[in-house]
Curated annotation (Swiss-Prot):
Protein's UniProt keywords contain Ribonucleoprotein: yes
Alphabetized GO MF terms: structural constituent of ribosome
Function recorded in the entry: Component of the 40S small ribosomal subunit. Plays an important role in controlling cell growth and proliferation through the selective translation of particular classes of mRNA.
InterPro entries, per database record: Ribosomal_eS6, Ribosomal_eS6-like, Ribosomal_eS6_CS
Family under the similarity heading: Belongs to the eukaryotic ribosomal protein eS6 family.
Record flagged with keyword Protein biosynthesis: no
Record's keyword terms, sorted: Phosphoprotein, Ribonucleoprotein, Ribosomal protein
Gene3D superfamilies recorded: 1.20.5.2650
Protein's name according to its UniProt entry: Small ribosomal subunit protein eS6
UniProt modification remark: Ribosomal protein S6 is the major substrate of protein kinases in eukaryote ribosomes.
Length: 251
């Protein structure tokens, strides 16, 4: 079985392969998020405590938290749930997918562990090396929270603290910093004012067009009523003339 061991304090990760069943027996029948002592893995892991974060079996089916079985089950999953990506599906569509339970069994090929407590000895590549966290926050409000800034302070110069310097393919030395999102500048305020002015202009135009339409509709209805009243008057005159003619003939 392979072990993916991660150390959050140093940001390092290492993969180990252990074939001895006696060493692996300490992890069997344990659930995800349970803590296991590393003494069973060997003398170098003495004093270490690991937390089980997940794993997958030899066919690549992942373990799912909350499924209390050591075997494989088929669950009806929707988009956003663990073990189901859901890309290319319709909204609300669910699919039945095979997942493995959250209990560790010998069928697993990879087990993901996190170091909760450091032991006596250093593990090479895990605890003796520290990788710097290069990626800081991008959002302006989170940068302010990180450096304890007020709204009046300029956020842009604080991003330089985690600016990255590297050499590109042409051999030139370049520096790179994340683009700050949701940064309020005079240009963004100007664009906001322009959007509001454009919206007001559209509303005024719609109101004037609606008023013109109502005016035109009223004139058309008046013309229609006038034509109808004229046709009714002509009809009445024809009927009265015909009635007078029949009365004179009968007399």
């Amino acid at each position: 079985m392979k072990f993916n061991i991660a150390n959050p304090t140093t940001g390092c990760q290492k993969k180990l392969e252990i074939d001895d069943d006696q060493k692996l027996r300490a992890f069997y029948d344990k659930r995800i998020s349970q803590e296991v002592s590393g003494d069973a893995l060997g003398e170098e892991f003495k004093g270490y405590v690991f937390k089980i974060m997940g794993g997958c079996d030899k066919q690549g089916f992942p373990m799912k938290q909350g499924v209390l079985t050591p075997g494989r089950v088929r669950l009806l999953l929707h988009r956003g749930t663990p073990c189901f990506r859901g890309y290319g599906r319709r909204n609300g569509e669910r699919r039945r997918k095979s997942v493995r339970g959250c209990i560790v069994s010998p069928d697993l090929s990879v087990l993901n562990l996190v170091i909760v407590k450091k032991g006596e000895n250093d593990l090479p590549g895990l605890t003796d090396v520290e990788k710097p966290r290069m990626r800081g926050p991008k959002r302006a409000s989170k940068i302010r929270k990180l450096f304890n800034l007020s709204k009046e302070d300029d956020v842009r110069k604080y991003v330089n603290t985690y600016r990255r310097t590297f050499t590109n393919k042409k051999g030139k030395t370049c520096s790179k910093a994340p683009k700050i999102q949701r940064l309020v500048t005079p240009l963004t305020l100007q664009r906001k004012r322009a959007r509001i002015a454009e919206k007001k202009k559209r509303v005024a135009k719609a109101k004037s067009e609606a008023a013109e339409y109502q005016k035109l509709l009223a004139s058309r209805l008046k013309e229609q009523r006038d034509r109808r009243s004229e046709s009714l008057a002509k009809k009445r005159s024809r009927l009265s003339a015909a009635a007078a003619k029949t009365a004179s003939v009968s007399a």
